[in-house]
């Protein structure tokens, strides 16, 4: 696998259309990410590169089979992966923008909308009829990314050397890419592209301890990961690693079934700020319209008949009798197929989130081979669908013992190791709680998929023994299945107990119990993970937001220029609003006075020696002398006086600093707004 960076330099404005407008000033806008930074999605880039390759094939420069081998077909994914193209240092900028929540003053003004304005200029166009005259009601505006911006996309190609036809094709199609986005045959979207080898980042190979039966990891999604759920499923991890083991010849076809049966891939759930979250238990409730308190019914909380309760949702972590909750950021993307003319949507887990899970096996050799895959790929993995463009790229980090995220309080006594038999269970009054951490598929005594109480008890006997009774069950049922990418067909669907299911049992004779492990069917894909615990002494929990108090001084380095431009734009907007608000009182303003401001404005704009404000004052004093010009002098002084009042009206310290650091530009905006407003005033008056 070779990795390269495709650099895209905009030689003209570009509208890499998202298919929507902003609803007010622009009919079509370019594509931006969640932070407001411009982006060229990988699917678009890959399509453009393929168009160039097919153009070369149609004229006989290359074979069509080479194009299909590199870019893929309907039945074959190809050997190339094209990542999203972003501006330089995009990841560091996003990290700093996330930290802005710690600074109260910045947090109020830095948002995706204001950042988009930094990277957007407005262009307009209209339709011309056969007589060469503009049609009525046909004016359209476009939000475009200005020329000069550079984008960088990571491209991976599954070859061992650059001295091959596949790499030469990639290099040629990148060099021949000349236009991107809307109206690229009418001046927009002219680009210059070149390919260069990526710098190899330092990577510390992960190792497994002798005799260890598990690997614990953290996955950080770099791109969005195609998924219909809000977690990374064990089946997607299983599919990725099995394919990698086969392609790298670490296992043979005859070892696949052995690997599938002996390696368990758990689901990976959200992990934030050192806290490991689990699916919300189905016995946890809130009072309706009150999300600040949580009540665990199965742990003994008695519902008040005068209150209405609803099931809690999301993911949770309990620490020190406080409950923390986490929501997963999901997104829906719409795409258009050029060949079939179909509009379709893709559901995905948003990038920039972390998930943690484990891989278990009694066969250490399989775990070593999985680690070898991770190390060979420098910790980069691709999960979910559409792995060849735009989606799927993530990083995986193996957790050492000292780096393990905090477990929930109701699990803190567990060593939390697969196959470990712990002695932490007390079973007060002989009662225990079994919780399912993932969807669980059960077969009854005759091998038929079932979720009735008898089937549940039949399967629980394998971990609790024969002498127990079920007292309470909090559960829901779901249908689980999947898709077999090798056979291009859906898998069989099963009825399962939903993750978060809780079962209260009473054991007559407590014996050694395996407190955590897997039960039921399809364990290798993450189904059936469970834990056994005692009833909690506390069954009411206060909710605490998983965040940090806002503090001053957020870390800003790479995002400094962007934040400065946002503050400058806001300062200019304040100047313009100030003009509009003041102009209602300009009832005695003559048209000649306004028109005489225009040459003063132009002269100040062309003066390269003096600042704009000084040049304007100098021009007025030199050219508008005498009693006849008193009106224009007084009006100019009034404009300057009103401008000087703006400083005291700006509340935000960052915007005020930008206003004072760019007073000449601010005054130019202020004066231009006065002239524009005056023209509109006299146009309406006529």
Which residues are covered by each model-predicted region?
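Conserved active-site/ligand-binding neighborhood in enzyme cores
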Residues: 1-686
């Amino acid at each position: 696998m070779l990795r390269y960076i495709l650099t895209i330099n905009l030689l003209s404005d570009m509208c890499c259309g998202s298919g929507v407008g902003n609803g007010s000033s622009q009919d079509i806008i370019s594509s931006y990410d969640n932070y407001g930074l411009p982006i060229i999605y990988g699917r678009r880039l890959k399509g453009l590169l393929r168009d160039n390759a097919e153009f070369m094939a149609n004229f006989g420069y290359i074979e069509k089979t080479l194009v299909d081998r590199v870019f893929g077909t309907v039945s074959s994914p190809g050997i190339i992966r094209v990542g999203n193209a972003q501006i330089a240092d995009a990841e560091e900028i996003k990290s700093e923008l996330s930290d802005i929540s710690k600074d109260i003053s910045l947090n109020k003004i830095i948002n995706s909308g204001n950042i988009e304005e930094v990277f957007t200029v407005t262009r307009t166009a209209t339709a011309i009829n056969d007589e060469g005259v503009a049609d009525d009601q046909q004016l359209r505006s476009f939000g475009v990314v200005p020329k000069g911006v550079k984008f960088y996309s990571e491209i991976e190609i599954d070859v061992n050397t650059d001295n091959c036809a596949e790499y030469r094709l990639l290099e040629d199609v990148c060099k021949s890419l000349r236009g991107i986005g809307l109206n690229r045959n009418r001046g927009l979207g002219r680009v210059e592209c070149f390919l260069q080898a990526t710098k190899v980042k330092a990577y510390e190979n992960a190792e497994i301890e002798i005799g260890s039966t598990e690997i614990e990891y953290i996955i950080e999604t770099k791109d969005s990961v195609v998924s219909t759920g809000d977690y990374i499923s064990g089946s997607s991890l299983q599919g990725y690693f099995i394919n990698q083991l086969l392609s790298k010849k670490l296992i043979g076809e005859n070892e696949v079934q052995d690997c599938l049966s002996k390696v368990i891939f758990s689901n990976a759930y959200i992990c934030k700020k050192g806290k490991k979250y689990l699916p919300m238990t189905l016995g946890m409730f809130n009072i309706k319209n009150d999300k600040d308190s949580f009540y665990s019914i199965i742990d003994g909380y008695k519902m008040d008949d005068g209150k209405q309760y609803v099931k809690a949702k999301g993911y949770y972590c309990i620490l020190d009798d406080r409950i923390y909750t986490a929501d997963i950021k999901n997104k829906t993307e719409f795409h258009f197929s050029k060949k079939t003319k179909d509009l379709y949507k893709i559901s995905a887990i948003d990038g920039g989130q972390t998930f943690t899970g484990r891989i278990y096996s009694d066969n250490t050799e399989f775990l070593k081979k999985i680690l070898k895959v991770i190390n060979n790929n420098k910790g980069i993995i691709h999960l979910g669908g559409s792995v060849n463009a735009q989606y799927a790229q993530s990083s995986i980090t193996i957790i050492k013992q000292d780096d393990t995220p905090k477990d929930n309080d109701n699990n803190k006594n567990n060593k939390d190791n697969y196959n470990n038999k712990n002695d932490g269970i007390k079973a007060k009054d002989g009662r225990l709680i079994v919780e399912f951490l993932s969807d669980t598929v059960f077969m009854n005594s005759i091998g038929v998929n079932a979720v009735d109480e008898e089937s549940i008890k039949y399967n629980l006997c394998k971990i609790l023994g024969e002498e127990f009774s079920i007292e309470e069950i909090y559960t829901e049922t779901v249908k689980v299945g999947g898709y077999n990418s090798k056979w291009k067909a859906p898998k069989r669907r099963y009825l399962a107990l939903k993750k978060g299911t809780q079962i209260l049992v009473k054991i007559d004779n407590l014996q050694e119990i395996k407190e955590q492990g897997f039960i039921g069917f399809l364990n290798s894909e993450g189904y059936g993970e469970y834990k056994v615990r005692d009833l909690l002494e506390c069954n009411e929990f206060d909710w605490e937001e998983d965040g940090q108090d806002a503090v001053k001084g957020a870390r800003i380095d790479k995002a400094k220029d962007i934040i400065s431009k946002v503050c400058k734009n806001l300062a200019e907007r304040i100047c313009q609003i100030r003009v509009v608000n003041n102009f209602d009182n300009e009832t005695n303003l003559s048209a000649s006075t306004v028109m005489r401001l225009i040459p003063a404005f132009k002269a100040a704009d062309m003066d390269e020696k003096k600042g704009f404000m000084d040049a304007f004052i100098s021009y007025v004093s030199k050219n508008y002398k005498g009693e006849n010009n008193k009106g224009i002098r007084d009006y100019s002084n009034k404009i300057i006086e009103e401008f000087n009042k703006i400083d005291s009206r700006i509340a935000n310290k960052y915007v005020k600093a930008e206003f004072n650091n760019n007073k000449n530009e601010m005054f130019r905006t202020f004066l231009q707004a006065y002239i524009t407003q005056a023209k509109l005033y006299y146009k309406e008056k006529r």
